[in-house]
Amino acid sequence: MTFTVIIPARFASSRLPGKPLADINGKPMVVHVMERAQESGAQRVIVATDHPDVEVAVRQAGGEVCLTRADHNSGTERLAEVIERYGFTDDDIIVNVQGDEPLIPSVIIRQVAENLAASKAGMATLAVPIETSEEAFNPNAVKVVTDAEGYALYFSRATIPWDRERFAQSKETIGDHFLRHIGIYAYRAGFVRRYVTWAPSQLEQIELLEQLRVLWYGEKIHVAVAKAVPSVGVDTPEDLARVRQVMAGQ
């Protein structure tokens, strides 16, 4: 099995301007992500960015980069542009790794690609067990429920499945059946081509979860429990400070 990693790295960020170039121990954040992807055994790693400064930083680090349009509404649309420009075949496996995940374990990048290759779905992703009630009831922690074969039934910011008997007594403890979705995806390139032709779905717009578009149009998403739990991504200056501290100790 071979696969390509594409790393969407949008320059603008309301909470952390210029985020892909944020310095972490002497390297831009996007370069750390690129190196993690290279460690996964990917045949090819491409950074997809809308800003020439990011392009320069990636090239200086010896990486491959595609300068994309700046008007994409999502990372998936940016991914689709790269797929078309590079001429990937419909069966090629593409892994989408977020450009703000400098601590992502390389093992799960390979895992999601292997899971897609072994499944009948056009798309695969990962999840980790939820262990605290705080996380189970946190709308920023996206929950997922699956069928018996590991295909997603639904993703939600709500607490799903609702443990009726337990929660009628107390919401301070939870069972072992909650899963938190991790935002890493593998796709077949042909699936991405279809995806970007679909109009946004009602559920997607209500929950603000792009992956619900896939379920809305009757497609399957394979979900597996991740072999390693990724650390915090970088959305805020506080996140950046924490990641710098963690990486300084490695």
Curated annotation (Swiss-Prot):
It is found in: Cytoplasm. It is an enzyme of class 2 (transferase). Signal peptide: none annotated. It comes from the Bacteria. Its EC number is 2.7.7.38. Its main location: cytoplasm. The keyword NADP does not apply. One of its GO terms (biological process) is CMP-keto-3-deoxy-D-manno-octulosonic acid biosynthetic process. One of its GO terms (molecular function) is 3-deoxy-manno-octulosonate cytidylyltransferase activity. InterPro entries: Cytidylyl_trans, KdsB, Nucleotide-diphossugar_trans. It catalyses: 3-deoxy-alpha-D-manno-oct-2-ulosonate + CTP = CMP-3-deoxy-beta-D-manno-octulosonate + diphosphate. GO terms for cellular component: cytosol. Pathway: Nucleotide-sugar biosynthesis; CMP-3-deoxy-D-manno-octulosonate biosynthesis; CMP-3-deoxy-D-manno-octulosonate from 3-deoxy-D-manno-octulosonate and CTP: step 1/1; Bacterial outer membrane biogenesis; lipopolysaccharide biosynthesis. Keywords: Cytoplasm, Lipopolysaccharide biosynthesis, Nucleotidyltransferase, Transferase. Activates KDO (a required 8-carbon sugar) for incorporation into bacterial lipopolysaccharide in Gram-negative bacteria. HAMAP family: KdsB. This is 3-deoxy-manno-octulosonate cytidylyltransferase. The lineage of its organism: Bacteria, Pseudomonadati, Pseudomonadota, Gammaproteobacteria, Enterobacterales. The gene is kdsB.
